[in-house]
Design a protein with these regions (language model features):
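Extreme N-terminal starter segment of soluble prokaryotic enzymes
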Residues: 1-5
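Conserved residues at the C-terminal ends of beta-strands
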Residues: 7, 64, 146
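Conserved acidic, metal-coordinating active-site core of Asp-based
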Residues: 93, 97-99, 104-177
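Active-site phosphate-binding/coordination module
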Residues: 16-117
């Protein structure tokens, strides 16, 4: 069985979430040669649906930085979650540092009710849930924190790694996220 796995942002996608015609033709050639194609991304399954329409295929999906894996038929064959107790502790630490979070479980997008979500339009396929307190959030697939100051995020990542690295994968994917 042959597989080609590709990252999404910055690899398959150009700016503005557009897939080039060249990329579409290349993937189509692979599929016609019976090569299994997979997309690996930090996005959730709902966050890649528009891109799949551009490609015109239903590939394997490795989503949420590996927390979820879906078959071409859409069946979830891996669903790794951060347990609720750990989620609560991590979110409290984030809030203690005066930062906001975006948290994801399947099609649900959680955020603090105190947070103004100006960019929710970029997540139209997710069900938005504004939570009163961190204890109200269930097990999660992924938590995102972003800030314009990379130093703030590096400090937070170090704090979270010291407290939770044995319980959850903690990483800085970009200077501001």
């Amino acid at each position: 069985m042959k597989f080609v796995v590709s990252d999404l942002d910055g690899t398959l996608l150009h700016s503005h979430n557009i897939v080039s015609e060249y990329t579409i033709r290349t993937i189509d050639k692979l599929v016609k040669k019976n090569v299994n194609f997979a997309i690996a991304t930090g996005r959730g399954q709902q966050g890649v649906q528009g891109i799949l329409k551009q490609l015109g295929i239903n590939p394997y999906l490795i989503c949420n930085n590996g927390a979820n894996i879906y078959t071409p038929e859409g069946e979830c064959i891996l669903d790794k979650r951060i347990p609720k107790k750990i989620v609560t502790e991590i979110l409290k630490e984030i809030r203690k540092n005066n930062l906001f979070y975006s948290a994801f479980l399947n099609e649900f997008y959680f955020h603090s009710k105190d947070e103004t979500v100006e960019d929710f339009t970029s997540r139209p396929l997710f069900t938005e849930v504004a939570v009163e307190k961190e204890e109200d959030i269930p097990d999660l697939n992924k938590i995102i924190v972003s800030d314009d100051n990379p130093k703030v995020l590096i400090e937070l990542v170090n704090i979270l790694k010291n407290k939770f690295s044995h319980l959850a994968e903690i990483m800085l994917s970009q200077p501001t996220c």
